[in-house]
Curated annotation (Swiss-Prot):
Swiss-Prot/TrEMBL GO biological process terms: translation
Keyword 4Fe-4S set for record: no
Molecular function terms, GO-annotated: structural constituent of ribosome
Family: Belongs to the bacterial ribosomal protein bL34 family.
Region (Disordered): 22-44
Domain of life of the organism encoding this protein: Bacteria
GO annotations of cellular component type: ribonucleoprotein complex; ribosome
Name of the protein this chain belongs to: Large ribosomal subunit protein bL34
Higher taxonomy: Bacteria, Pseudomonadati, Pseudomonadota, Gammaproteobacteria, Methylococcales
PANTHER family hit by this protein: LARGE RIBOSOMAL SUBUNIT PROTEIN BL34M, MITOCHONDRIAL RIBOSOMAL PROTEIN 34 FAMILY MEMBER
Keywords from the named record: Ribonucleoprotein, Ribosomal protein
């Protein structure tokens, strides 16, 4: 059986990156929540 996590930098950035988060309203909500919480890293 193949493992579920097959690392790829491109896929990681395209789905979880900053610009991907900024594209949608929900993604911007995620970023603002992480800013409010004081996260050092907002996105991948």
């Amino acid at each position: 059986m193949k493992r579920t996590y097959q690392p790829s930098k491109i896929k990681r950035v395209r789905t979880h990156g900053f610009r991907a988060r900024m594209k949608t309203r929900g993604g911007r909500a995620v970023l603002s929540a992480r800013r409010a919480k004081g996260r050092r890293k907002l996105s991948v």
